[in-house]
Amino acid sequence: MALILDGVRLRRRGEIWLDDISLELSSGMTMLVGPMSAGKTTLMRVVAGLLPPDAGRITVNGTDVTSVSVRKRSVAFVYQQFINYPSLSVYENIASPLRLARDLPRAGIDRRVREVAELMGIGDLLGRRPAELSGGQQQRTAIARALARPVDVLLLDEPLANLDFKLREQLRADLRSMFQGSSSVVLYSTADPAEALTFAAPTVVLGEGRVRHVGEVAEMYARPPTLAVAAALSDPPLNLLPGVVRAGRVECLGTSFPAPPAHPPAHSPAQDDPAQDGPAQDVVLAVRPHHVTIGGGGPGTLAFPAEIRLAEVTGSATFLHLLLAGRLHLVAQLPGTQLFVPGESTTAFVDPAHLFVFDENGGRLLAASAVSAVSTASTAEVDLHG
């Protein structure tokens, strides 16, 4: 099974919603990751046939479906909201797409409803109505309805976003095992980097209606090709600092460290490789908050004098907001509960091994200092906060 989008464009009210989207997705799960307003829901609505594109083609398993109506597309859609028929029981909600198909006998419908309900862990709730269910049970019902009828493409638009943490973790694990090896194309959208890493599936990063990158999520996390990709896979947000590469060193706020070799190795003039001597070039340094420490660092660690502005304690972590050089904001994510006094001075430490060096526009990763590669064979072990 394959879903192919070729040059798909969509413009509404004078704004570009989708800009030349070209993707080829095969059977199994693919993650669609990006911030709010990236175009994730819009892209799914176009694939489902709810929004006609202004240009481009959509094919499913070799058949052009660009102009095919919603009813005639072999597509199921699960929304972020718990969308179920309130007057129908769980059983009837799941059975509804099967009855519309009108090609299954009653016994076949009953068997399929019960199979899917058991798969989703709601087999004992078939007689209840949606109002009698918890949020997690309602979303399981919505997903069961989407799974009831075999489809070529299954679209899940942030299906866990409205659930509490415990339910989200439980259902995420269930969905991951359920869709591994699926014969359908399963496109799952999320704005949560941790969710993308947990599913360990091929990933499309979307931003401002454009495809930013396609690849393995662990590799993108370890060595993001652009600042936009790094930002999409970082929560809390990245810390960004201005820097200059000069004479083979990276300079930042009075500190410096040897410029690492270009990533990927440069095949163009020496100025593209920060480790080589060449004209000075402005760069952007990015570091994740959990790689900023307070109170000490090892050999070669960069030290930044800072003023404490705010300490946010969440229980498992303390987010320390700092001001560098009187103008730059830096956040340190520290383990556990730690107490700090706003207005006091401290020193923030960053190991250059955890810095990404981007060009001044953030459009290209120039270097990733000794950032260890993450095995794509065990992507689920990637820890977003450690």
Where are the model-predicted features located?
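Short beta-strand immediately N-terminal to the Walker A/P-loop
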Residues: T30-L32
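ABC ATPase nucleotide-binding domains
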Residues: S74, N84-A228
